[in-house]
Amino acid sequence: MPKTIRNEYYKKLSYESLMQAHLESRKGKSTRKEIIQFNLKQEEYIMWLYEQLKNRTYRHSGYTSFYVTEPKLRRIEKSIYIDRIVHRWYVDNFMQEYFVKSFSYSSFACLKGKGMHNACLYVQEMMKHCKRIWNNYYVIKMDVAKYFQNIDKQILYEILCRKIKDKNLLWLTRKILYSNGVDKGLPIGNYTSQCFANIYLNELDQYMKHKLKLKYTCRYMDDVVALVNTKKEAIEKLNLIRSFLKEKLCLELNRKTQIFQSTQGVNFCGYKINAYRLKIRDKGKRKLKKKVKFLEKQVKQGKMTCIEAHKYLSGHLGYINVANTKNLENKLFATEI
């Protein structure tokens, strides 16, 4: 795989590749009004978009903002559908091909086959291994403060420029990167933002692996776990990581960052992880039970069928199955709704 991207923009740009990006973008959303309207003239719209990108006259539109409360209060910035096609085309043809494949094996989140469940199982395997070689050891649990809001775009652009040597692709990169009109922070909701955020903290992954020589690390977006032999080593490594994040990436760790003995278990991605046990955290259990009650109410009010409710619940089965929580599963799925 080439280390840099050269003269690839126009090679990848075609009516067919943009149409494919459209087909990928609309998956699971084909009943939405904006997509129904787009589909009515999709060939015309895709050809127009192709000409815009070919002539470098494409301009990113503004965003619609709204808030979500789960898992916490966050502001989501939604771009119009045709811009989302560009995001998909950009990520699938360049980011996935040239950046994602070079990520550390211990990096998870928004990567195919490397979701939350995989990250938790990976941490558990690390803990098993460290228990065998050290018996008792220490955990460095790190969480970046307001990660998406604090990403410095100039630093991110410089990181991207190391690999992107195609001036046309750099033009589009800047169009997307600065599309929300601010120099700091990525819009939560963009398909590109997840990838950019992973590229940004890949710098930390490489630093921990090559400079600090940390063998046992796992990162799920901005949540990081590192396992070390002694408390002294944990303190030293954490101080170095703090300095690196502040000096190189203009980021800080939040107050949830801590050092503790492995016997306490690790709270990570909604699970409580020990070397030989993996449980859903109490907070996660409460949310699941709350969802069951909500579905019961929806069915009783005639807003949802029993089949739809059970289908929705089944979507959480993977989350439950990863953990050793058979009793919880039986309680939830025995509910008559």
Give names to the regions the model predicted.
Residues 45, 52-53, 121-221, 225-241, ...:
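Conserved polymerase palm-domain catalytic core
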